[in-house]
């Protein structure tokens, strides 16, 4: 069972209900909820929720780690094998489209980039700026330079690292994929699609609630580690704005406005990405999701605990 959707769409509640009803294990498919440093700001399930049914891959990665899609697939394979061995229904839930695509389409086989090349590229990025790196990328991989936004620091650095390390453009590697862990025709996949304005209001309310729950203290503890700002955990929605507040650059109210706005923009991108990249997912509203999923369970024998290994 795959449950995707934008942030704050009600995925966790649906997954918890299904796991309780059908003997399932909830497997995280959200890149930011992997990080143990970020329980509050990423809206991870609470300890009380995690105690109700088995949860896997939540808070298992240190913020200093640049956790890749390949590492996720490896971890997901272990969680899936454990679920099947225990006779539990695996329920993959999250909002990271690349993770779902890797699960159902396979993963491009990009070789690891040597540390010395990665460090050299990051050093030049900090020293010379993103425009210089974009110009260098245009010489080595014109197609990538044309495709990427000139200010997209992370993706420009990644594309340059790969072409320097392998001699091949990143797009070439993306054309070669490993076999999928979950073939699309063997899973039930839904995308929760709330009404936009209601979703955005929920995002704003949730960000305010996270601040009341201690998100600022959580981010302060992360900032004290002085990690590379390009690491994924350091770019989680709300983290950069709250760090700016902690540095005295903006007020807490301004940080809250920026953090909520960044999250709304991300939700909008999630709608677009899933519509174009994973059209096989069935789009449902949160209100109809329970009924639709129950119908899928009744009509699909693989959606049962007794055949969870199929």
From Swiss-Prot:
It catalyses: adenosine(37) in tRNA + dimethylallyl diphosphate = N(6)-dimethylallyladenosine(37) in tRNA + diphosphate. SUPFAM superfamilies: P-loop containing nucleoside triphosphate hydrolases (SSF52540). The keyword Transcription does not apply. Keywords: ATP-binding, Magnesium, Nucleotide-binding, Transferase, tRNA processing. Substrate binds at residues 7-12. GO terms for biological process: tRNA modification. Pfam families: IPPT (PF01715). Residues 30-33 are annotated as: Interaction with substrate tRNA. Its cofactor is Mg(2+). The record marks 96, 118 as: Interaction with substrate tRNA. Catalyzes the transfer of a dimethylallyl group onto the adenine at position 37 in tRNAs that read codons beginning with uridine, leading to the formation of N6-(dimethylallyl)adenosine (i(6)A). This is tRNA dimethylallyltransferase. It comes from Rhodopseudomonas palustris (strain HaA2). The lineage of its organism: Bacteria, Pseudomonadati, Pseudomonadota, Alphaproteobacteria, Hyphomicrobiales.
């Amino acid at each position: 069972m795959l449950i995707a959707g934008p942030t704050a769409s009600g995925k966790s509640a649906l997954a918890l209900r299904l796991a309780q009803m059908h003997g399932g294990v909830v497997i995280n498919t959200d890149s930011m909820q992997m990080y143990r440093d970020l329980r509050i700001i990423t809206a991870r399930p609470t300890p009380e929720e995690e105690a109700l049914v088995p949860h896997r891959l939540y808070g298992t990665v240190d913020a200093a780690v640049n956790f890749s899609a390949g590492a996720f697939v490896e971890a997901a394979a272990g969680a899936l094998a454990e679920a099947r061995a225990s006779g539990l229904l695996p329920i993959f839930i999250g909002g990271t489209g690349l993770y779902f695509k890797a699960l159902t389409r396979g993963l491009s086989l990009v070789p690891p980039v040597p540390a010395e090349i990665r460090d050299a590229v990051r050093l030049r990025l900090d020293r010379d700026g993103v425009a210089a790196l974009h110009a260098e990328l245009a010489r080595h991989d014109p197609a990538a330079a044309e495709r990427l936004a000139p200010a997209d620091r992370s993706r420009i650095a990644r594309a340059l690292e790969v072409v320097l390390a392998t001699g091949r453009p990143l797009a070439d590697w993306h054309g070669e994929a490993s076999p999928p862990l979950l073939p699309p025709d063997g899973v039930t996949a839904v995308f929760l699609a709330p009404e936009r304005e209601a979703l955005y209001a929920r995002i704003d309310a949730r960000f305010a609630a996270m601040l009341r729950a201690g998100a600022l203290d959580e981010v302060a503890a992360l900032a004290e580690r002085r990690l590379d700002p390009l690491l994924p955990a350091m770019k989680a929605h709300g983290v950069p704005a709250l760090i700016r507040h902690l540095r005295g650059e903006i007020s807490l109210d301004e940080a809250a406005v920026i953090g909520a706005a960044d999250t709304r923009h991300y939700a909008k991108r999630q709608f677009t990405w899933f519509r174009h990249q994973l059209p096989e997912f069935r789009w449902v509203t949160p209100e109809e999701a329970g009924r639709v999923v129950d119908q899928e369970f009744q009509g699909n024998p693989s959606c049962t605990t007794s055949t969870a290994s199929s």
